[in-house]
Amino acid sequence: MKKFLIPSAFVLTIVCVSMLTACGGGQRQNSPAKVDKKTITLSGAFAIYPTAVQWGEAFQRLHPEVKVEVSAGGAGKGAADCIAGLVDIGMVSREPDKAELDKGILAVPICHDGVFTIISEMNPVAEEIAAKGMTRSQLFALYKEQKKMTWEEVVGKSGGKTPVSVYTRSDACGAAATFAKFLGKLKQEDLTGIGINSDPQMINAVLNDPSGISYTNFSYIFGKDGRIVTGAKVVSIDVNENGKIDPEESVQARADA
C-alpha cells in the first residue's frame, strides 16, 4: 500500500491490521482441533465480515460437509465471543489488547485494513473539501473537543450557516479504535458524536445528512468496481497542513488507497 492510511484517504502511517482471533481459552487452549466438526462459527468486526463470508463460501465449496456461519457485531463482540467460547473464530479489526491475550487467544494477522473519513456528496462545500481536505487538528476539535463548527469555517469561509454533524460508532469496533489513535493516541470512548452501530448504518447516516461527517472501513466505502460508493465522498487528509490536498494525500478511488 502506498501513501498513508487512516481515517480518510489518509494513506499514512495508521494501518489497521485486521485479525482472525483463533479462540483457545480455557481447557481448549492446547487441545487439537476436532476433525469431525460440521460447523465453524465466526463473529466480530464488520470490517472483516465481507471477506470472511467469501472465504466461508469458498471453504464450503471445498468441504461441502462443513457449514461456515459468519455474523458481524463489531470487533469487541468478536473478541468477547471468542474468549467466552461462543464462536470458533473471533474477527477483530485491531490489535488485541493484553487483557485479551492473557485470556488465551491466539491472534493471526490476515490482511491490512484502512479507515476513511467520509461526507455526503451533497455537502454544501464538497468541492472545497475535495481541494483542501481536512487536517488532523480539525478532526480532533470536532471529535474530542466537541467544538461547534460550520462547514464553511472548515474550508475557510466566513458567514457559515451549516453546522457540522459528527457521527461516531456506538459499538466497540476497530474502525473507531484506529480513528481515535490517529487523532492523538485516544481511545474509542474519547470520541464524541451521534452514535451509530455498524459500518452500513454509519454510511447510510452520512448519505442522508449533507452536513454529516464520519469514518468507515475500506470494505464498505469502496465498491467492487473500485469506486467510492454512490452518494459519498472520502475526505482526504491534509497531512502537511499546507491548505491543499497534494497528490500523495488524495484518495478518490480504491487504487489510491
Set out the residue ranges of the language-model regions.
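Bacterial N-terminal signal peptides that target proteins for export
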Residues: 1-10
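Core hydrophobic alpha-helical transmembrane segments of single-pass membrane proteins
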Residues: 10-17
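Exported/periplasmic ABC-transporter solute-binding proteins
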Residues: 23-83, 92-101, 106-108, 118-257
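Short, solvent-exposed loop/turn segments at the edges of secondary structure
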Residues: 110-114
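C-terminal motif of bacterial Sec signal peptides marking the signal peptidase cleavage site
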Residues: 18-22
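Conserved functional loop/turn residues at catalytic and ligand-binding sites
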Residues: 86
